[in-house]
């Protein structure tokens, strides 16, 4: 037993040991009696007592059967241990042992498990679990059966026994998907498979979005490993979500492959699209490539157009305008060159004078406006934006300078669409104990720019609503705000050159000293010279000026030369708020609009130009775009 190496034949057939106990009466060299002839036929009667069936054993007598059984049991244990080390992974070996072999662990897992450092007690999350039995009850049985028959040494091995036909197909599908998942970079594998199937890169049709939160209506999707039964009804499932769909199906070793160009009914980000299609296709999000299409690449548009003509594609809905513009001849002929005058007219109509706002808002019109699309296709966008903003500022400034105060107030009233309540303004003035008649007289002279009445001072304790009242009036009339913090610059009064009304908030002692020394002529309402940065100085009349302060300049002897130039109103009470923190008196644009309409005649704002417009004479609307000749009837 000890001489036989290996245990390949143990436990696999009927080749066990049996024990024979015999009594030997003769030894080598004994003389055989002649009374026992050798040719006598053996009848078996002399073998009756050959096997000892007695149960009782003499105490202390050696039992060879028990000894042999113990030796065989020890050999079996050693053989099983060798098989376990050969075919079963040791629980003490790390999962990375396959990539980083270790001699000590291979020789002895227990020795490899010994560590001086403290190991983390946290369980490591396994990214990919081994194949588990499917929920339908079908399993794959792998068995190795070795049969050793008498008279032959051949070994028959059955590798895999499949329980059902469905299990074989599902197993192959799971094996292919597992192969895809276990790739080092899944996205690279998907890109490679897409290029092998379609002959072009996925990024030739789509543009990358780095953020998964960016919203878009048009998307290009490539999905892999789809079950073939979904292909028939996918179009029906997709139609409720989309306005347009271009569907292509191909097959590969991973299953069905979908290439989809779609326009959703509302904007979606990449996460929302992946969840929606993952639910419809019954695949994980990692098996999809999702990016928006290239909108300005003729080659990409031509690909979708040519594929739509073949019978390999299913199309529903109206094609997007960017696709039709690059493939339909009618749209191609309609493309025209960029016209700056149209852009300037658009900015003037919307009262856009900031370059950044002009650039952003006009770029949004590229899908519906031909001139905006030509603007995006130009290499001089920055120059066009700068020129457009400059021209708009020139037009608006010239138009403002030509208007009288009554025309300007009417223009500002027309910009407010809502109707308010003029009593809110009157109630606030009464709450501050301001004589309404005196205030209306001062406001009338203030708006007309009469000398010595060109400045109104609102003074009082803090938190009485002085700045809120003045800011609301300046906001409605479209005025400018000056800050004394810029008084060290020669250009801090430059905004007064283009304003109809101005405000100086929170004038301190230093500010009043500056006004007493340098701005007496401005408070009179007489023409004065303003220095402008990088431009020549301009001479113009100072617009009406509202000043808020905690100091009453009309009673301080330090500024006695300003007493006759400033009309003062005191706000003694704190500005009230309700329980929700909202102001009790709403000083909004709609209420100021109602106030000026109600007090139009009291403020002497009637003008001949306004009367002509009220009598039916239309005003000339500014147009910087040449008109088109109408067809004869």
UniProtKB/Swiss-Prot annotation:
UniProt KW keywords: ATP-binding, DNA replication, DNA-binding, Early protein, Helicase, Host nucleus, Hydrolase, Isomerase, Isopeptide bond, Nucleotide-binding, Phosphoprotein, Ubl conjugation
Motif (Nuclear export signal): 107-116
Region annotation (Disordered) ranges: 148-168, 609-633
The organism of origin for this protein: Human papillomavirus type 54
Protein name: Replication protein E1
Reactions catalysed according to its record: Couples ATP hydrolysis with the unwinding of duplex DNA by translocating in the 3'-5' direction; ATP + H2O = ADP + phosphate + H(+)
GO biological process per UniProt: DNA replication
Renumbered residue ranges of the record's region DNA-binding region: 169-335
Enzyme Commission designation: 5.6.2.4
Record PTM: Phosphorylated.
Cross-link (Glycyl lysine isopeptide (Lys-Gly) (interchain with G-Cter in SUMO)): 541
Main location: host cell
GO CC terms in record: host cell nucleus
Coiled-coil segments on the chain, per record: none
Phosphoserine PTM positions: 90, 94, 108
